[in-house]
Structures are given as C-alpha cells and as structure tokens.
UniProtKB/Swiss-Prot annotation:
It comes from the Bacteria. InterPro entries: Ribosomal_uS19_SF. One of its GO terms (biological process) is translation. One of its GO terms (cellular component) is ribonucleoprotein complex. The lineage of its organism: Bacteria, Bacillati, Mycoplasmatota, Mollicutes, Acholeplasmatales. Keywords: Ribonucleoprotein, Ribosomal protein, RNA-binding, rRNA-binding. Residues 1-25 are annotated as: Disordered. It comes from Acholeplasma laidlawii. This is Small ribosomal subunit protein uS19. Gene3D superfamilies: 30s Ribosomal Protein S19, Chain A. Belongs to the universal ribosomal protein uS19 family.
C-alpha cells in the first residue's frame, strides 16, 4: 500500500481505486 495516500487521498483513490477502501477505511 501507499502510506502517502493518508495525506494524499485525492491522488490515491484517483490512481488506485482498490486502495480507496484503505484510505477511507
């Protein structure tokens, strides 16, 4: 996973929709 997705959920769910659940928990 990408830890930077925590403070950058915008590019996270935008680049990885599968990790969207990880960011939003």
């Amino acid at each position: 996973g990408h830890k930077l997705g925590e403070f950058a959920p915008t590019r996270t769910f935008r680049g990885h929709k599968k990790e969207d659940k990880k960011v939003k928990r």
